[in-house]
Amino acid sequence: MDEKRLTHLQQLEAESIHIIREVAAEFENPVMLYSIGKDSSVMLHLARKAFYPGTLPFPLLHVDTGWKFREMYEFRDRTAKNYGFELLVHRNLQGEAMGINPFVHGSAKHTDIMKTEGLKQALDKYGFDAAFGGARRDEEKSRAKERIYSFRDRSHRWDPKNQRPELWRNYNGQINKGESIRVFPLSNWTELDVWQYIYLEQIDIVPLYFAKLRPVLEREGTLIMVDDNRIDLKPGEVISQRKVRFRTLGCWPLTGAVKSDAETLPEIIEEMLISTTSERQGRLIDSDQSASMELKKRQGYF
């Protein structure tokens, strides 16, 4: 393949497909983490291309906190049915028994117990030795320094000072028993790359990414969409209809919407071209403590 003849997006696509095939061939029991967001949708599309016309040689895993948007659950189930892939859904039952939720316990504890511990439980339960994730280096500073092959110890912890070199797209996947890796095929993509690829490939995504009137309240400068009756209204808070969309998706009480008129993919791309803020500005879990994301990754977060 002559890379000089490939467009920028074609080069990114080829690199990602190479990584996915490499991991599938090298590891005994890989899995693809499926968070239902735009990056997961792109990664799933790339995986289907990588093994077409065959089926995916690994399952998809959704670590469900019980607090995702209803439209995310509907999209997840519809996608699994349409494509026919194996979907594993894991929930931290101990956390649910403790009544852990983002309103009472805060974003840090909720994320640690329901997402990080839930993920570690699932990886241990099924014995996965490699897990694909849709994280990108342009999202956040700790992810910017993480390798494509991100090695984790027996406790799933990440040590940023103990990473292997990745020269000329050569990846060292040797691990000891009990260790594992997280793999990020979209590492070199940007948010704009993702949206342009979604547009060109006509990839189906959750409707929450498109602007429309939605019930929201403003809390500490963040627009929170009220998705069900579990909302914990504070004195003076008022729910109103505003035209908003989401640049990133997570648990609905911890995910801020942005004011927008972008109702189509071209309009979203145009919005991205003039944006000066990170898509993760709306993720409250990224700012719940100092060096929040790196600390979470050291503890086993994806």
From Swiss-Prot:
Pathway annotation? Sulfur metabolism; hydrogen sulfide biosynthesis; sulfite from sulfate: step 1/3
- Keyword Transferase assigned: yes
Q: Which EC class is the enzyme in?
A: transferase
Q: Which domain of life is it from?
A: Bacteria
Q: Which residues form a coiled coil?
A: none
- Which pairs are disulfide-linked? none
Cited Pfam families? PAPS_reduct (PF01507)
Q: Which GO terms describe its biological process?
A: hydrogen sulfide biosynthetic process; sulfate assimilation
* EC nos: 2.7.7.4
Q: Which GO terms describe its molecular function?
A: ATP binding; sulfate adenylyltransferase (ATP) activity
User: Which UniProt keywords are listed?
Assistant: ATP-binding, Nucleotide-binding, Nucleotidyltransferase, Transferase
Q: Which InterPro entries match?
A: PAPS_reduct_dom, Rossmann-like_a/b/a_fold, SO4_adenylTrfase_ssu, Sulfate_adenylyltrnsfr_sub2
What is catalyzed by this enzyme? sulfate + ATP + H(+) = adenosine 5'-phosphosulfate + diphosphate
The record's HAMAP family line, in alphabetical order, gives:
Sulf_adenylyltr_sub2
Q: What does the annotation say about its assembly with partners?
A: Heterodimer composed of CysD, the smaller subunit, and CysN.
The record describes the protein's role as: With CysN forms the ATP sulfurylase (ATPS) that catalyzes the adenylation of sulfate producing adenosine 5'-phosphosulfate (APS) and diphosphate, the first enzymatic step in sulfur assimilation pathway. APS synthesis involves the formation of a high-energy phosphoric-sulfuric acid anhydride bond driven by GTP hydrolysis by CysN coupled to ATP hydrolysis by CysD.
What NCBIfam families does the record point to? CysD, PRK05253.1, PRK12563.1
Question: Can you tell me which family this protein belongs to?
Answer: Belongs to the PAPS reductase family. CysD subfamily.
State the name under which the record lists this protein.
Sulfate adenylyltransferase subunit 2
- What is the organism field in this record? Photorhabdus laumondii subsp. laumondii (strain DSM 15139 / CIP 105565 / TT01) (Photorhabdus luminescens subsp. laumondii)
At the highest ranks, the source species' classification is: Bacteria, Pseudomonadati, Pseudomonadota, Gammaproteobacteria, Enterobacterales
